[in-house]
Amino acid sequence: MVLKITLSMDDMHTFHLNDGRNVNELNPKELLLYAAADCAGRTIVALLKEHISDVKLLELTLKGTLSTPSVVAESRFTSFNIIYHAECRALKEQLTISRALNLAHDKYCGLLQMLRRIAPLSHEISIVTTD
């Protein structure tokens, strides 16, 4: 079974669930995914503030594959995949955003580092310029 959490950044640089659910409605395994995606998002925002880069949209989707066909106490994560999707206004910002995404993923987000100790963590990056 695959659990999936998608977070989007609002104008105030706060992340929210995309599916309309409240955090209180998530099961503990989904909460783990939520916390890791939120940590990565906050880390990216902090890195981008240093470079005064303008991200129009930032969305993170974190998927976790479970060892069982349904969520039960014995379920263990066997792999994780995080998809970063960003939109910026200028082509020159793509490099800065890409660097921030990679730094957050590889080095600065402590919860992603923790997930790596549980199971393999892969990632995908999509950056689109809207101008």
Where on the chain are the PLM-derived regions?
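Extended beta-strand/beta-hairpin segments
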Residues: 1-35, 42-131
